[in-house]
């Protein structure tokens, strides 16, 4: 199975590493516009294979989309990263042009590929390629909720003093600091609601810390995070190529689900060989419904800035 990763920056390189280390793809093509950059990253990773023993072949190329031909999955990470004080929405003007050009080239050589969108604002970028290229909704997956959910589960586990593996939780709605919706009502520790362990004030703090997770890292690092995002992408690719049918929150095109139409936003999805195989409609309480629809409205407003 062949995977292409567009953009050899921190997120692109880290997800390539995770994919290779797990040996579920036979080949990963890492593409970048900077001369020699992807080739260097690929060489470094392939030299690591002598230590780690993985068999995945990694090929680096400079803007040569012909080398990506017949990819099963294409990951798009290219675009301007967030800078300190910059919102994801402010990225839209620059990144919409980048994503459109990349997608056109990708589809020329891999017309049946499943596309995982990582470029921010991810809900809007996912919607853009849905509308511009008219692909089946199952083939465009926005990677936002997987990352937000990882941050939510980490914060819960930290507060509970338990392993992250003991904690289940989910974040839906938009992949934005203000619009994401961590679902406290459905978060559990070994099947028991976290509200049995933590008071309301602590839970509210966890929600706010989750929402600010990306911005906090941008402030500390001077750029966007890459380890957790790369791992989130790799988990999606793994679920597709191995047909795992995992339920992972992703930005998906809604056509009536949750009472919404014509919008890409974070919802729990079953991810398998065909991409998004099913959108799971959760039972939300009234407060969660109100916040979810408000998040949808905010994304629609950002989408209004797109030029097709």
Which residue stretches match the model-derived regions?
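Conserved N-terminal Rossmann-fold NAD(P) cofactor-binding segment
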Residues: 33-71, 300-308
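Extreme N-terminal starter segment of soluble prokaryotic enzymes
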Residues: 1-3
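Rossmann-like NAD(P)-binding element
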Residues: 51-113
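C-terminal substrate-binding/catalytic lobe of Rossmann-fold NAD(P)-dependent dehydrogenases
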Residues: 132-139, 148-308
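Glycine-rich Rossmann-fold phosphate-binding loop(s) that bind the pyrophosphate
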Residues: 8-9
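N-terminal Rossmann-fold NAD(P) dinucleotide-binding loop
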Residues: 12-13
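Rossmann-like NAD(P)(H) cofactor-binding subdomain of soluble oxidoreductases
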Residues: 87-153
